Amino acid sequence: MNSKLTVIVLLALITIASCGLINEKKVQQYLDEKLPNGVVKGALKSLVHKAAKNQNLCAFNVDTVGMCDADCKRQGKAKGVCHGTKCKCDVELSYKK
């Protein structure tokens, strides 16, 4: 039960951090206070960092809801392409050519 609650709290913190309601630094400080040093703490901190860097809901090179492409078109660019969790305008993935 305790591990399930921990996962729910972590997912809630990631969601709040990625929405910009609180910043990543505060979530990282919370994890530093609550978790002992070790592999799990490092993995969770890495996961929070990756989730907080997310732009336009890009995940695993996929524009999940079309926000990347729409944002680039608003800027006058031809196409938006997800590179991991980042959105880049008019820059194709080099390994998919």
From Swiss-Prot:
Name the record gives this protein: Scorpine-like peptide Ev37
Main function: Selectively inhibits Kv1.3/KCNA3 channel (IC(50)=0.95 uM). Both N-terminal and C-terminal domains are likely involved in the interaction with Kv1.3/KCNA3, since neither its N-terminal domain (1-36) nor its C-terminal domain (37-78) block Kv1.3/KCNA3 channel.
Residues in the signal sequence: 1-19
Similarity comment: Belongs to the long chain scorpion toxin family. Class 3 subfamily.
SS bonds (residue pairs): C58-C82, C68-C87, C72-C89
Broad class of where this protein is predominantly found: secreted
Record organism: Euscorpiops validus
GO cellular component, one term: extracellular region
Gene Ontology MF, one: toxin activity
Annotated localization: Secreted
Any further remark recorded for this protein: Negative results: does not block Kv1.1/KCNA1 and Kv1.2/KCNA2 channels. Neither the full-length toxin nor the two individual domains (N-terminal (1-36) and C-terminal (37-78) domains) show any cytolytic effects on bacteria or red blood cells.
Record key words, sorted: Disulfide bond, Ion channel impairing toxin, Potassium channel impairing toxin, Secreted, Signal, Toxin, Voltage-gated potassium channel impairing toxin
Tissues/organs with expression: Expressed by the venom gland.
Biotechnological exploitation: Promising broad-spectrum antiviral agent that functions by alkalizing acidic organelles in host cells, which prevents viral genome release from endosomes and restricts viral entry. Is effective at noncytotoxic concentrations against viruses that enter host cells through low pH-dependent fusion, including dengue virus type 2 (DENV-2), hepatitis C virus (HCV), Zika virus (ZIKV), and herpes simplex virus type 1 (HSV-1). Due to its specific mechanism of action and broad-spectrum effectiveness, is a potential candidate for development as an antiviral drug.
Source organism, top-level taxon: Eukaryota
Coiled coil feature spans: none
The BetaSPN-type CS-alpha/beta domain, residue ranges: 55-95
Listed InterPro entries: Long_scorpion_toxin_alpha/beta
Keyword ATP-binding set for record: no
Pfam (any one): Scorpion_toxin_alpha-beta
